[in-house]
């Protein structure tokens, strides 16, 4: 039985899907105006791991991750670059897919784009107005009236009064309440716009996800995920919109928030992954401590980055530094070295192997605890190193594969590495051949010179009876 920590109820709950034959998960994706950063990498890898695990448990899963392809930042960046919005977003969607593929992230089943779902957004806004949950303002915008939704604040755990006191809310004379948020923005000169009952304009960000998830999944669904930064206001607003439009909620067993509200959500389980921190501070563009996936992949193998993300619990903050990535590289190298030294065979049932599998499953079923699951992989690798048991090595590879690790040829991983290491594989092989000749000629000075040169490039040699093997350090 899988248990999941539900942000909405603030507790771990047994995973019991609405329809076990049709499990549905929606994750907020990228706003495509720039290259993806490490925070995006964490969202992609974490929910890829969760999707893989649910499928491993036999659930028929439909995984949707949306693409925000219309937004203030997109409009501004396209204008700055002097290119069309379509050209800009197409370029960064392709870059996002390249980054995700490199990190071993399987493509979601559906990737809806906001611009392809405008009619659904307009229809939902019309319903919200009819239901008394939204109002058109004199400036041509349409706002959601938060005081008309009794459960507003349930996800962030704050009352409307708390939120008004604590949030920096921009003053807007057209709103009835400072916390009211925009559903439809009136057109501005030179910006893309669509026709609507309230005049030309474009959707607000929050309505996009409500309309796309309802269009694909219906009124209620199982899992909604995203980064912790989306909990408020984005996900809070999604609940208000979706429940405000349809009136349909998932039963949360009459649960209440800590200030006594009834819980009313169209999603049964809300999941949020933790922030990435750099030197103890949240990674963000404004602080300038910001790394794109591409920058990191110039230094580190993509599987090292995936492993670095999965070594931490998905809800914990993840501290980024070169030292932490070097540590992840060393740890993953140890696992691949085990598989190189004991080539895996198809695992057969065995008492020892079955016990490792059971413990791996127990860890993953406990709110996707990859920290404990990875610890099981290291224990299993230790056993393989002691016994040289090819079937246990096969078990190690198979368990790693469940979370998207250890599927490459070990030699290819160990000899691969960032191009910035300076020496190509061919140059390394050539130097090793020259060193071998120098040793045969008893030219120890030349042999040592070549070893030192390789050492400078972090190439580690291992001399054994069958010759010399190497890997990148």
Swiss-Prot record:
One of its GO terms (biological process) is cysteinyl-tRNA aminoacylation. Binds 1 zinc ion per subunit. Its cofactor is Zn(2+). InterPro entries: Cys-tRNA-ligase (IPR015803), Cys-tRNA-synt_Ia_DALR (IPR015273), Cys-tRNA/MSH_ligase (IPR024909), CysS_C (IPR056411), Rossmann-like_a/b/a_fold (IPR014729), tRNA-synt_1_cat_dom (IPR032678), tRNAsynth_Ia_anticodon-bd (IPR009080). A motif ('HIGH' region) lies at residues 30-40. It holds the Pfam family tRNA-synt_1e. A motif ('KMSKS' region) lies at residues 282-286. ATP binds at residue 285. It catalyses: tRNA(Cys) + L-cysteine + ATP = L-cysteinyl-tRNA(Cys) + AMP + diphosphate. GO terms for molecular function: ATP binding; cysteine-tRNA ligase activity; zinc ion binding. SUPFAM superfamilies: Anticodon-binding domain of a subclass of class I aminoacyl-tRNA synthetases, Nucleotidylyl transferase. One of its GO terms (cellular component) is cytosol. Keywords: Aminoacyl-tRNA synthetase, ATP-binding, Cytoplasm, Ligase, Metal-binding, Nucleotide-binding, Protein biosynthesis, Zinc. Its EC number is 6.1.1.16. Zn(2+) binds at residues 28, 209, 234, 238. It is found in: Cytoplasm. It comes from the Bacteria. Monomer. Belongs to the class-I aminoacyl-tRNA synthetase family. HAMAP family: Cys_tRNA_synth. This is Cysteine--tRNA ligase. It comes from Neisseria meningitidis serogroup B (strain ATCC BAA-335 / MC58). The lineage of its organism: Bacteria, Pseudomonadati, Pseudomonadota, Betaproteobacteria, Neisseriales. The gene is cysS.
């Amino acid at each position: 039985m899988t248990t999941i920590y539900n942000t909405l109820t603030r507790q771990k709950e047994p995973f019991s899907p609405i329809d076990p034959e049709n499990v549905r998960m929606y994750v907020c994706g990228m706003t495509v105006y720039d290259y993806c950063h490490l925070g995006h990498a964490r969202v992609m890898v974490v929910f890829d791991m969760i999707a893989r695990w649910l499928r491993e448990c036999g659930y028929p899963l439909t995984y949707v991750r949306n693409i925000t392809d219309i937004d203030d930042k997109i409009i501004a960046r396209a204008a700055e670059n002097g290119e069309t919005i379509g050209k800009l977003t197409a370029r960064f969607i392709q870059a996002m897919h390249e980054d995700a593929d490199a990190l071993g992230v399987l493509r979601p089943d559906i990737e809806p784009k906001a611009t392809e779902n405008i009619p659904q957004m307009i229809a939902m806004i019309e319903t919200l107005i009819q239901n008394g949950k939204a109002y058109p303002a004199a400036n041509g915008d349409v706002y959601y009236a938060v005081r008309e939704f009794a459960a507003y604040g349930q996800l962030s755990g704050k009352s409307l009064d708390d939120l008004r006191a604590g949030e920096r809310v921009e003053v807007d004379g057209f709103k009835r309440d400072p916390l009211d948020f925009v559903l439809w923005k009136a057109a501005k000169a030179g910006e893309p716009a669509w026709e609507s009952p309230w005049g030309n304009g474009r959707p607000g960000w929050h309505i996009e996800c409500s309309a796309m998830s309802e269009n694909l999944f219906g009124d209620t669904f199982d899992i909604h995920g995203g980064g912790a930064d989306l909990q408020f206001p984005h996900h809070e607003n999604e609940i208000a919109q979706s429940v405000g439009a349809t009136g349909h909620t998932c039963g949360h067993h009459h649960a209440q928030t800590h200030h006594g509200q009834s819980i009313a959500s169209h999603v049964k389980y809300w999941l949020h992954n933790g922030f990435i921190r750099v030197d103890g501070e949240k990674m963000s563009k404004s602080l300038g401590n910001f790394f794109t996936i591409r920058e990191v992949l110039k230094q580190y193998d993509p599987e090292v980055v995936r492993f670095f993300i999965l070594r931490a619990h998905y809800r914990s903050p993840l501290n980024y530094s070169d030292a932490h990535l070097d540590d992840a590289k060393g740890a993953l190298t140890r696992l691949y070295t085990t598989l190189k030294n004991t080539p895996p065979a198809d695992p057969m049932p065995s008492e020892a192997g079955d016990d490792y599998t059971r413990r791996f499953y127990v860890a993953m079923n406990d709110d996707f605890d990859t920290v404990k699951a990875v610890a099981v992989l290291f224990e299993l690798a230790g056993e393989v190193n002691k016994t040289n048991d090819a079937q246990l090595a096969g078990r190690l590879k198979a368990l790693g594969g469940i979370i998207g690790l250890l599927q490459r040829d070990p030699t290819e991983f160990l000899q691969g590495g960032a191009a910035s290491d300076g020496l190509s594989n061919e140059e390394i092989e050539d130097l090793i051949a020259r060193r071998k000749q120098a040793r045969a000629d008893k030219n120890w000075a030349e042999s040592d010179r070549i070893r030192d040169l390789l050492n400078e490039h972090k190439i580690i040699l291992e001399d054994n009876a069958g010759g010399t093997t190497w890997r990148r350090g």
